[in-house]
C-alpha cells in the first residue's frame, strides 16, 4: 500500500481571521478607554484669558473683522465655535451609534467582532458625555439639529 500523494499547498498560510483581528482590537480598545466623568476635573477653573480653540482655527481669524474685535470678543467667538464643534460631534457620534446598533441587530452576539463594536459604542457614548459636559462647563447652549433634521437622521439606512 502506498502513502497518499501530498497535495500542493494552495499558497501561504492564511493570515489572522476577522475574529482574531477583532479580538486584538477589543483588547487594545479596552486598555485605552477612559471615563470622562471621573478622569477629567470638571470643577477646575477656566482661564478667562484663554481661547477655547487655537485662534488660527476660528472662522474670522486673519480678517479685518477679527482684527477689529477686542480680545474678549475673540475669546467669546472661539467659545461659541468650540461649542458648535462639540455639538456637531455629539450628533455625529449619535448617528454612528445608531448605525452600529442597527448592524448589531443582525450579528452573532457572541462574536468577537460584535464585542469590539460594543466596545466602540461605549467609547462613542463616553465621547458624547464628555462633549456634553464640556459644553455645560463653558456655559453655552448646545446647537441641536432641527426637528426635520432629526427625522432625516432617524431615516438614514445605516
Residue ranges of predicted features:
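Active-site-adjacent scaffolding segments
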Residues: 128-158
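Active-site metal-coordination segments of metallo-dependent hydrolases
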Residues: 117
Amino acid at each position: 500500500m502506498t502513502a497518499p500523494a501530498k497535495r500542493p499547498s494552495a499558497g501561504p498560510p492564511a493570515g489572522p481571521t476577522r475574529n482574531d483581528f477583532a479580538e486584538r482590537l477589543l483588547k487594545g480598545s479596552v486598555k485605552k478607554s477612559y471615563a470622562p466623568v471621573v478622569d477629567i476635573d470638571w470643577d477646575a477653573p477656566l482661564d478667562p484669558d484663554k481661547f477655547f480653540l487655537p485662534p488660527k482655527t476660528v472662522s474670522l481669524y486673519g480678517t479685518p473683522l477679527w482684527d477689529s474685535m477686542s480680545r474678549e470678543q475673540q475669546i467669546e467667538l472661539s467659545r461659541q465655535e468650540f461649542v458648535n464643534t462639540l455639538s456637531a460631534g455629539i450628533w455625529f457620534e449619535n448617528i454612528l451609534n445608531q448605525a452600529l446598533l442597527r448592524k448589531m441587530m443582525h450579528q452573532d452576539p457572541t462574536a468577537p467582532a460584535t464585542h469590539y463594536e460594543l466596545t466602540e459604542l461605549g467609547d462613542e457614548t463616553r465621547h458624547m458625555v464628555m462633549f456634553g459636559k464640556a459644553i455645560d462647563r463653558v456655559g453655552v447652549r448646545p446647537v441641536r439639529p432641527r426637528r426635520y433634521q432629526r427625522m432625516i437622521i432617524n431615516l438614514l439606512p445605516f
